[in-house]
Swiss-Prot record:
Keywords from the UniProt entry: Hydrolase, Multifunctional enzyme, Purine biosynthesis, Transferase
Protein name per its UniProtKB record: Bifunctional purine biosynthesis protein PurH
Organism annotation: Bartonella tribocorum (strain CIP 105476 / IBS 506)
GO MF: IMP cyclohydrolase activity; phosphoribosylaminoimidazolecarboxamide formyltransferase activity
Pathway: Purine metabolism; IMP biosynthesis via de novo pathway; 5-formamido-1-(5-phospho-D-ribosyl)imidazole-4-carboxamide from 5-amino-1-(5-phospho-D-ribosyl)imidazole-4-carboxamide (10-formyl THF route): step 1/1; Purine metabolism; IMP biosynthesis via de novo pathway; IMP from 5-formamido-1-(5-phospho-D-ribosyl)imidazole-4-carboxamide: step 1/1
Domain text: The IMP cyclohydrolase activity resides in the N-terminal region.
Length: 539
């Protein structure tokens, strides 16, 4: 059994008379301390660099060493880890035994703790060596934060600079007191803060030790936005941002339009990750997404060309979708995009002329990321299950890095090979089972999310035929196309369906028990076929 709690009344309002400040980021701390001291005559206690900053501003500050009677030692590693500090943070003021211990040991309660921690994650991101990173693991700060948060009945704890103003407003409202509600909220934020800090430390140790599956795995993020609802109106939703420095929806700036919904964020992320497969230094590329699946993807001489080719694939599904671009949105492409209803445009940047065109559509959201994510970069993906979390590394295999194997009698032509590689890039981002028909560096038919591969092949061909009819063409778009499959063909039927649709070449991972049967069928149909050796399931 754990510790048995004592039942003492918790005051609704508690006066702030004594405050301890120990901050790594000094932003705003002088003005905050000045307001507290000038308005409420609060006694100020501080440590090291924070004390020097406050003293330099003319504030009367008592160094923590004066309180403890013990100097900072070991290069500042030990300064607040002392009973006179932790007793002041943890003492239950209504408990006679606690009061007796405090009086006997000259412990004076601390009513407000202001701490922000050593910049651990920033130190990692700076490229510092392991020893420097280790030194930037805060010990005393988290210990004090946890102590103060546990004793929120009497002690407030501030861990974020943007809480300074709300604390001053609270004190003004209650004549120098903090309400129980505020102290309780601050405690919750404090424990979330230290949990996130420890999560980052544990993750760094795991990376340093090259442990891919640590015995405990934690994830953290700070609240970025609360949405009106989730995938459906009856579901609650929020977006939390972590510290991964990857260009995308999390780092993007919303230049115009209303706040993004849960589905907007999910679809836009899928769109931008797909278009990032295409190097902006080599080609212009556009991806059109609906329900996290592509309904059109293309490369072109410029973004307008790529957009129109992508739209040709399935202009019905593209209505109300997401448009992702791998280059700066220009005027010509913007003029085409606004011709149909679009939810979101995401691009590395946009010219002023393009922004002016988009601005005419008030509800059209324009996101600017500042760059393109590197598809080769790793990272973790997580999915919650009932009672658990599935974790895997990001699918960061790029077809350019693969050794492709021609397994048929006929070798793909240069144009076919270009289109095969294009189609396989797209198939990586289509929900399984995925079949992608492509021609001239553009998708012409996409079959997604079917339980059988042959159904995906038939649906993709059918949609291509529909698009051709809408465009007034006399022959289907899949004639003379190539086809990509995200996984192997378990039987020859899917490949035969592709051949019947007019495809001339196939790219797939290979690895089926019936590979020879499928290769024989390809040869009989005069198809060229390439194995990649890599599967791209996506669920």
């Amino acid at each position: 059994m754990g510790v048995v709690a004592k039942n003492f009344p918790i005051p609704d309002l508690h006066r702030v008379r004594r405050i301890l400040l120990s901050v790594s980021d000094k932003t705003g701390v002088v003005a905050f301390a000045q307001a507290l001291h000038a308005t409420y005559s609060v006694e100020l206690i501080s440590t090291g660099g924070t004390a020097k900053t406050l003293i330099a501003a003319g504030l009367p500050v008592k160094d923590v060493s004066e309180v403890t009677g013990f100097p900072e030692i070991m290069d500042g590693r030990v300064k607040t880890l002392h009973p006179l500090i932790h007793g002041a943070l943890l003492g239950i003021r209504e408990d006679p035994s606690h009061r007796e211990a405090m009086e006997k040991n000259s412990i004076h309660g601390i009513d407000l703790l202001v701490v922000n921690l050593y910049p651990f994650e920033e130190t990692i991101q700076s490229g510092a060596d392991g020893k420097t990173i280790l030194e930037n693991i805060d010990i005393g700060g988290p210990a004090m934060i946890r102590a103060a948060a546990k004793n929120y009945a009497y002690t407030g704890v501030v861990t974020a600079i943007n809480d300074y103003d709300s604390i001053l407003a609270e004190l003004k409202q209650h004549n120098g007191c903090l309400s129980l509600s505020m102290r309780h909220q601050l405690a919750m934020r404090a424990y979330a803060h230290t949990a996130a800090y420890d999560t980052a430390i544990a993750a760094w140790f795991a990376r340093d030790l090259k442990i891919e599956t640590p015995s405990w795995q934690s994830f953290s993020g700070h609240l970025e936005s609360v949405m009106r609802y989730g995938e459906n109106p009856h579901q609650q939703a929020a977006f939390y941002r972590n510290n991964e420095k990857r260009f995308g929806v999390a780092t993007a700036k919303l230049l115009q339009g209303k706040a993004l919904s849960y589905n907007n964020l999910n679809d836009t992320d899928a769109a931008f990750e797909l278009v990032a497969e295409f190097d902006p230094q080599k080609t212009a590329a556009v991806a059109l997404i609906k329900h996290a699946n592509p309904c059109g993807v293309a490369e072109g001489e410029n973004l307008k060309d790529a957009y129109l080719k992508a739209l040709m694939c399935d202009n019905v599904s593209a209505f109300g979708g997401i448009v992702a671009l791998n280059q700066t949105l220009d005027e010509e492409c913007a003029e085409e995009i606004v011709k149909i209803f679009t939810e979101v445009i995401i691009a590395p940047d946009a010219t002023m002329a393009a922004r002016e065109i988009i601005a005419k559509k008030k509800n059209l959201r324009l996101l600017i990321t500042g760059g393109i994510p590197n598809p080769r970069c790793g990272g973790l993906l997580a999915k919650t299950l009932a009672g658990g979390i599935l974790v895997q590394s990001r699918d960061n295999v790029v077809i350019d890095d693969l050794k492709l194997q021609v397994v048929t009698k006929r070798t793909p032509t240069q144009d076919e090979m270009r289109d095969l590689q294009f189609a396989f890039r797209v198939a990586k981002h289509v929900k399984s089972n995925a079949i992608v028909y492509a021609k001239n560096s553009a998708t012409v038919g996409i079959g997604a999310g079917q339980m059988s591969r042959i159904d995906s092949a038939k649906i993709a061909a059918s949609k291509a035929a529909e698009s051709a009819r809408r465009a007034g063409l006399t022959e289907t778009l899949t004639k003379g196309s190539v086809v990509a499959s995200d996984a192997f063909f378990p039987f020859a039927d899917g490949l035969l369906a592709a051949a019947a649709a007019g495809a001339t070449a196939v790219i797939q991972p290979g690895g089926s028990m019936r590979d020879e049967e499928v290769i024989t069928a390809a040869d009989e149909q005069g198809l060229a076929m390439v194995f990649t050796g890599i599967r791209h399931f996506r669920h």
